Amino acid sequence: MKPVKSTAEILAFKVLNRDINKTWVDWAVEMLMAGFDTENLAILAGEFEPYNQFQLQDLTTKVLSELQLDLTDKDQTIKNYACFLIDKSLVGELDNFKVLDILKDICIELDYEKYLYDFYSLYFAKDDLSYSENQWYWDGATRENIEKIITDYFTNWKSNCLTN
């Protein structure tokens, strides 16, 4: 059995030490519906607000351990999350600017991690072009071609996801 697609997001949240929220609970429900069944996963699926972060951080660690989900390679976990977000963008479920915003923030959080820096640059190129004719982040990007540049970059990134 393969974990549900949103597992990439949950693992990224864990390695980035994000607060537990409804996204985690929804993921736990999805996992149960997909046939995964552990005691702690069922407990997580039954949680509701307000969330006790101390208790839930411990619970989610147990859930991920029970499901044998690997968190040892932080960079690969983040790359998998980028693949998840890009996939959602390419099928129209998530706006590409929102994807760039999320990955730009992670890039900053991770001290301008090299493998995320293009997302940072594309975010600010598109942002600048939303109110100006000029941008200095992505060579050759204009208002006329920024969407294609982003889509091509996402498509290329996704093709690399499939080889990992």
Give the residues covered by each predicted segment.
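Acidic, Ser/Pro/Thr-rich low-complexity regulatory regions
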Residues: 1-164
